[in-house]
A protein has these predicted regions:
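Glycine-rich, flexible N-terminal cofactor/catalytic loop recognition
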Residues: 1-65
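Beta-strand/loop-alpha-helix module characteristic of Rossmann-like adenine-cofactor folds
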Residues: 8-9, 120-179
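Loop/turn-to-beta-strand initiation segments
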Residues: 9-11, 80-85, 161-162
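Short glycine-rich anion-binding loops that position phosphate/pyrophosphate groups of nucleotides
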Residues: 18-21, 89-93, 169-171
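Short active-site oxyanion
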Residues: 32-38, 111-113, 162-163
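Conserved helicase motor
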Residues: 61-68, 141-145
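Short phosphate-binding loop-to-helix
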Residues: 64-79, 98
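Short glycine-cluster motifs
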Residues: 80-139
Length: 179
């Protein structure tokens, strides 16, 4: 006998498409439609996704600018029995986004967390690169400060594993020139 999802008081960490809105699971869509509300990085981005699939659920902004204030409120909603879907603008929440703090706090206070897997930009880049993928390192975003960035790049150059990192489109050209 399978439990019906979503369950009350659960935090659902839901992977979202990273480029093609069709890259989402039926289970993820069911969760997004049936949780109490969706905590999302940018409501405009998430609105595009849920509108595409005819989902009419409340969106709550949860991003790097407001996460410090919102984590306690979201934890209280979960404790009161609400079910929440946490989504990122693209890919898996918590990978270089504020979802990490909510998940950490929910774990700390003993709440139930279920991950609904989905696309991950880092792994997608790795498997399509043709580079060795059995052992790799994920660095996330490089530091913005040049001296710290150079130090990190030097450390990366000393390992013999494929390294994945994120960089914003606006800083990518500058980074490539530094390399």
């Amino acid at each position: 006998h399978k439990k019906q999802e979503p369950e009350s008081g659960f935090l659902y960490v839901v992977g979202t498409p990273i480029g093609n809105l069709s890259d989402i699971s039926i289970r993820a869509l069911n969760i997004l439609e049936n949780v109490s509300f969706i905590a999302c990085e940018d409501t405009r981005q998430t609105q595009k996704l849920i509108k595409r699939y005819g989902i009419n659920n409340k969106l709550v902004s949860f991003n790097k600018h407001n996460s410090f204030k919102k984590v306690p409120n979201l934890i209280n909603f979960l404790k009161s029995g609400e079910s929440i879907a946490l989504v990122s603008d693209a890919g898996m929440p918590s990978i270089c986004d504020p979802g990490e703090e909510l998940i950490k706090e929910a774990k700390f206070v003993g709440l139930n967390i279920i991950c609904i897997p989905g696309p991950c930009a880092a792994i997608t880049a790795l498997v399509s690169s043709g580079l060795p993928s059995s052992k790799f390192i994920f660095e996330g975003f490089l530091p913005k400060k040049k001296s710290e960035r150079e130090k990190t790049l030097l450390e990366i150059s000393r390992n013999n594993r494929t390294t994945i990192l994120f960089e914003s489109p606006t800083r990518l050209k500058k980074l490539l020139n530094e390399l």
